[in-house]
Amino acid sequence: MAHPSQLGLQDAASPVMEELLHFHDHALMIVFLISTLVFYIILAMMTTKMTDKYILDAQEIEIVWTLLPAIVLILVALPSLRILYLIDEVENPHLTIKAMGHQWYWSYEYTDYEELSFDSYMTPLQDLNPGQFRLLETDHRMVIPMESLIRVLISAEDVLHSWAVPALGVKMDAVPGRLNQITFMISRPGLYYGQCSEICGANHSFMPIVLEAIPLDPFEDWSSSMLEEAX
């Protein structure tokens, strides 16, 4: 969960987000080393007279400043491609949920259960309980089992939306007439908050996403009670 004045990323709650945190640190270290080298060169040129302003040809320097950027790009690209393929990999998901974006709320349909679907609206400020978060709470949470591979099919009814939960490292555009998918697995129980991440109109900031991860047995009890209410 994010907190005020936070500078870093949220704590990882999924294997994909853990990989993204490692990649962030890896890329940040490369950026730091490059910035240090550039700053040193600028400082050296400003503070010393030991520079040659009249070099017309230097094959060694040209080779170095061609190879170094290529090596840096490879060091950034390979881990990035690995994570991209990891995100796209879908194999025997335990649960499939369809998330549909509307102006301005989300609707969820558990396709593995008959008649298990609901709309999820933002909880108004006057209805919040102590300890709940403004603009982030919903009247119906998307409840899922922890340590299970979840596939979410994402689309939109009207305009472009985007379904994003930072702690899980997932973000996917919801496009009218198109079905996108993402997969993730939550490592521990808890509440995970997200928001629509594509400007979709006047109430774009009032489209929160709340995921509640619970063990499998309580999830089965919850789904049974929801089906009984629907019947």
UniProtKB/Swiss-Prot annotation:
Entry's EC annotation: 7.1.1.9
Quaternary state and interactors: Component of the cytochrome c oxidase (complex IV, CIV), a multisubunit enzyme composed of 14 subunits. The complex is composed of a catalytic core of 3 subunits MT-CO1, MT-CO2 and MT-CO3, encoded in the mitochondrial DNA, and 11 supernumerary subunits COX4I, COX5A, COX5B, COX6A, COX6B, COX6C, COX7A, COX7B, COX7C, COX8 and NDUFA4, which are encoded in the nuclear genome.
Positions of transmembrane segments: 15-45, 60-87
UniProt-listed SUPFAM superfamilies: Cupredoxins, Cytochrome c oxidase subunit II-like, transmembrane region
Stated family: Belongs to the cytochrome c oxidase subunit 2 family.
Name of this chain's protein: Cytochrome c oxidase subunit 2
Membrane topology: Multi-pass membrane protein
Comment on bound cofactor: Binds a dinuclear copper A center per subunit.
Function per UniProt: Component of the cytochrome c oxidase, the last enzyme in the mitochondrial electron transport chain which drives oxidative phosphorylation. The respiratory chain contains 3 multisubunit complexes succinate dehydrogenase (complex II, CII), ubiquinol-cytochrome c oxidoreductase (cytochrome b-c1 complex, complex III, CIII) and cytochrome c oxidase (complex IV, CIV), that cooperate to transfer electrons derived from NADH and succinate to molecular oxygen, creating an electrochemical gradient over the inner membrane that drives transmembrane transport and the ATP synthase.
Name of encoding gene: MT-CO2
Signal peptide: none
Subcellular localization: Mitochondrion inner membrane
Protein transport in keyword set: no
One GO CC term, this protein: respiratory chain complex IV
Binding site for Cu cation A1: 161, 196, 200, 207
MF term (GO), any: cytochrome-c oxidase activity
Source organism of the structure: Latimeria chalumnae
Residue positions binding Mg(2+): 198
